[in-house]
Amino acid sequence: MSTRSVSIPTHALIEIIAAPVLMAAPFLLGFNLATGAVALALGTLLMGLAISTVTDQRTIPLTAHASFDYALAVATIVTGLVFGVATSDPVATAFLVGFGAAHLALTASTRYSARGA
């Protein structure tokens, strides 16, 4: 029995919903300019990554997608920690670290196989 219970289409749907949340957070939560710019860039990357999986002709292999997902999740966590220390902004830190941890959990729970085996 596999613990990876999230299918690729479900994973992509969650990312498509989550990416705008990450992009809107700097405006809604009042991040400083630098933290906001990085959050906006990470959200844009997440949206592009999600869109690359919903077409019949994937633009990147699923194994690469998994690697990019892990890297993006870790980058979001590190961004939250670095900017949290640099700016003393607990809201931005909590949001980015939490978002990155949730993305890491989603990535670890996803079956990266074309047929959902």
Predicted segment positions?
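Extracellular/lumenal glycan-associated surfaces
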Residues: 11-31, 43-53, 69-86, 99-111
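Short, aromatic-rich membrane-interface segments at the entry and exit
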Residues: 33-40, 88-95
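Intrinsic N-terminal pre-sequences and regulatory tails
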Residues: 1-13, 112-117
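Short juxtamembrane and helix-loop transition motifs at transmembrane-helix boundaries
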Residues: 1-7, 25-34, 53-61
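A cytosolic-side transmembrane-helix exit/cap motif
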Residues: 56-64, 113-117
